[in-house]
């Protein structure tokens, strides 16, 4: 057997007849499967033990030899070799076909490989192969054309005319095989290359296609005649099993039926040939044999599929590979695993960040082997069998052992759908009673989990290495930041936010205001005994908190704060400033001086002079967590988060906030606002009836009126709200709900969407406090159903987008430290019109500079070339007034098959420089795909006034960008750099003409009359600039400008869509994806290289091909960059395993086989498929070839490991 972890590459080619014979262990001559009386396989049948091996381990068919000691002996009675039964999964047989048969993949695929090789049309081929026409093979001295078709009648006439034997014409696959044998590859290729020099149009395209196929045969060493089969391999019987069902009936794989048909027809054909049967009967049998083999290889590809019982099409060999249920996606890319469990999740508020609760019964089953080993080691049982009995009986002693076993053994928890890598995290198990898994409340956001019946799967990492990786790399406490934007993903939510919000509220005149305490304990004592309220403003001695970073002027003073804030600050990391105001200045620069009493000052005076601060909201807590992480990294942050969670839950319980109908306020002037809107709508309808506006205009005006009415109510609601109202507190803190929910409770529900996406004109005037009328309720449910269906469709769409993204970028891995490129990317803030969608500061964080950045006024060097830009540095650059910076970018990285560390920058999930081996492609794909469900589905209908196009937004726009489709509402772009000299309107054709004067000439562009212009006369425009509003077609932009412009444009467009929906994604993720779309070039002129014109190839391969030619002084090849959508890019990857497992499996494999493609196993998918460890992370060669050293020889590196000790 090949050692799967040793081989370097994998090749696929056509199998020659001799190769098939060398695989085979014998010929299958009979269509029988098993004897239904004895249930033994029939001799020479499809399950024959002589050919395929014994059905029982170490036992021949007749039973003469049993036991392992006869290993390798071939029984003299039954001829079966004594060996393991599993050889029945490996040994193949064969069928000697009595007539050649064409392979349907090569004849029927698009383009037909057989047709291109022979220069015949697929129609002609079909007529010949299925015995409808003769083809002239050798005209000899007759005037017939080679490869011309003759009908039966014409053939007989020609025979009479020229005499028997004067020419050779045949029909069937045999004829095709003869023609294929006659193809002289070298001569044909030379001839086509000559033809290409002069050909153009259709002729050229066809020549390029033929040249491609012939060249593939020539280079791969495959012979064209192997596309026709003379011998058919039979796959091992255990891969097409036959199992007995309870009722004594049998269930067999469809393949057995298909093989039986082939054998039956083959045997019948052999008999007919022996009997010298009439030609027409033999021909018919040959055609049936051809059809039987077609059905076996790819049933349904030609004609009607062969059906089984209940007219179900049989599953052929091709179907075994294709689709979600095929071999690739079902068994190779994802397998079911042992040592796993699944249960409902419940909340575990008492757990630490790195813990999860595992039910006892589940744990004992999952850790059974470990427990059994310990039982034997402790000599509670003599052997493993007895230990197993002990566990199954539920002996008392096993529970103590289980506690020991799981102590340092992390488990993985996974929630489907796993949209990003935070969907699987490691935890230390804690045994609990009950049957539900307990999950820490803070990791819910990463999993997108809630406790309304969600289920999660649990897995046990078995090997030492797996446990170490789970503990060091996957522990939940390590995953504080979200890989997509580097912001904390573990922000408290709901009750935790509400508790901390309530705790940090301030209130004037509450009991205990103005009291001064010597330390925290005294303040808490006063609060517990009812002398001071949580919200009352009191004084505390600064010296009681010596570890806080006070300014010198603040020490030894009294500080004004609240009892709640004393408690709140008590859980903060010691080195963080005392948080008195919910803003970043307090967090980064320290507590403001105004809260400190000067000696002899009256505390009440100071209190009266201070404004009441707003409490800490969800966003503030997020900022505190981010700052904590930045300063103290993982261990301290996760411990702090647990303290924050406990404090939040505790005080949320004490606060006892509830919601009753009385908490929903009544808006005093609601009737006035609604009457005014009714009045306005009536006026609009009057104007419409008089013909003063179109129906579209009227619709927009009416909906706008109602929208404004709703906004007016909302505004009034905010003005009159009571900050102590529980609903307002929930909304304001960010714990639950937003102003829109609140205004539906207290204002009006507003306009609803109809199922077709159009907004209905009749609004719902009531709110939920008043209750809805029957008609309003109907409209309301109408809109709600639309929402539900949208969500369901969106989820599927978004999932498919993620799959395509992962597929195209799965082989992008950080391969080296620095690629040494001298190119960079000039970046500035991304704007949409006047609006800034992404600031320069955000874009600079965590990137390396390409050139040094200077202060625009003083000329001082702010940061040198090739330096990492930190958050503080980015702020400094922007504050200095710099508007554009040249940075290292994934777009310009010169690393092959991946990216280098400097071009990528920091890893957003850790905040540190990215490590070599990080699978950045997959992370990028997940970061873009995961928020896909949050994007809207709709294409906005602007009511036909503002523009003549529908603006595509949300998910459809993202798909449009990544698939490089022509956008809806395309903008007209200029190909000339110069000035707009004239815009003339032509009423007759309803168009405008824009004239751009450049140095080389005048550009004239026709624009639709209704399009909104982006330029005016006198404006200076660059090549590729949009003249009208709308999206630019990226392929056009690539023709006019260069690759980098297209990449920059696509990056900006993706960011616009996500940022407009409030989703932040790091630029680098989009860069990785966009770069994959522009990896290929098309060869235009091959020069002196041996490339073929029109070939699509990787940029790096093209450069290599040119390098040698340039060195030897030849003419290099020229090429043009090609922009491909992600689906096409995935299929065009260099790895045929990855492409075949993605889509269009048969086409990919057909093509790969003809070319004799080699897969060098560089990506992740290929390695998962063949079962090798993936070449990313710790699976990279550089991390695997490790020499162990004694501990005392090297210094022990202190890793920020979070474990039970962190308590």
From Swiss-Prot:
Q: Which GO terms describe its molecular function?
A: DNA binding; DNA-directed RNA polymerase activity; magnesium ion binding; zinc ion binding
Binding-site positions, Mg(2+): 450, 452, 454
Broad class of enzyme this protein falls into: transferase
Give the residues the record marks as binding Zn(2+) 2.
819, 893, 900, 903
Any one cellular component term from GO for this entry? DNA-directed RNA polymerase complex
Which keywords does this Swiss-Prot/TrEMBL entry list? DNA-directed RNA polymerase, Magnesium, Metal-binding, Nucleotidyltransferase, Transcription, Transferase, Zinc
Q: Which GO terms describe its biological process?
A: DNA-templated transcription
Known catalysed reaction(s)?
RNA(n) + a ribonucleoside 5'-triphosphate = RNA(n+1) + diphosphate
This protein's record includes keyword Zinc? yes
Specify which residues bind Zn(2+) 1 according to the UniProt entry for this protein. Answer: 60, 62, 75, 78
Task: Identify the EC number(s).
Answer: 2.7.7.6
Role played: DNA-dependent RNA polymerase catalyzes the transcription of DNA into RNA using the four ribonucleoside triphosphates as substrates.
Task: Report the family membership.
Answer: Belongs to the RNA polymerase beta' chain family.
| HAMAP family, sorted | RNApol_bact_RpoC
Can you name this protein? Answer: DNA-directed RNA polymerase subunit beta'
The record lists the organism as Streptococcus pyogenes serotype M3 (strain ATCC BAA-595 / MGAS315)
Q: Which gene encodes it?
A: rpoC
